[in-house]
């Protein structure tokens, strides 16, 4: 097993252990359980945050999250968005989880593999995903089929700057909210 696979499995194992620990502590008040929020940006590198020393880009809200949160500092991404997302959600390398590309049917997680949302949901957490999904737009690949109780997502790899099939162009776009197309207002 190469180093990258060990790192991905370590991240997944950490999340799984956190779920088990929170489940074991279910006698404690729910308010004492930690909130778990995973922020994954698309096509943003490590040096593109002001907290990491970028002299041009100012990212005060992300810097605040950085300062107040647990950070996974040794997670290695794939050269494309879909394999990276699949690895984070399953803890399994893209070559084994099925999401190895961004097109041609190779952007689908194997349905028998549970996601981190399944484990957190089983531990009593509310789960949600918001934003780009690009891991399948039909059953059994949609967020609501993969353990997410709440979802607002876009069923493609990007929102183009010219209107798409849905008329999306970053303003007043149509997203899929818990399985139903819904018009949203704003940017």
Segments (PLM) and residue ranges:
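Bacterial N-terminal signal peptides
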Residues: 10-21
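Formylglycine-dependent sulfatase
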Residues: 24-187
């Amino acid at each position: 097993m190469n180093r990258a696979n060990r790192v991905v499995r370590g991240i997944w194992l950490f999340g799984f252990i956190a779920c088990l620990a929170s489940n074991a502590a279910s006698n404690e008040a729910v308010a004492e359980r930690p909130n778990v929020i995973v922020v994954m940006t698309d096509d943003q590198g490590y040096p593109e945050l002001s907290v990491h020393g970028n002299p041009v880009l100012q990212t005060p809200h992300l810097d605040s999250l950085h300062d107040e949160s647990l950070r996974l500092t040794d997670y290695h991404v794939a050269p494309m968005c879909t394999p990276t997302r699949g690895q984070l959600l399953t803890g399994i390398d893209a070559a084994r989880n099925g999401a190895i590309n961004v097109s041609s049917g190779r952007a689908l997680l194997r349905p028998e593999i549970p996601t981190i949302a399944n484990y957190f949901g089983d531990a009593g957490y509310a789960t949600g995903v918001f934003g780009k999904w690009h891991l399948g737009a039909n059953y059994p690949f949609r967020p609501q089929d993969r353990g997410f109780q709440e979802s607002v997502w876009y069923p493609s790899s990007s929102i183009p700057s010219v209107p798409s099939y849905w008329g999306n162009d970053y303003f007043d776009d149509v997203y899929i909210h818990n399985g139903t197309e819904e018009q949203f207002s704003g940017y």
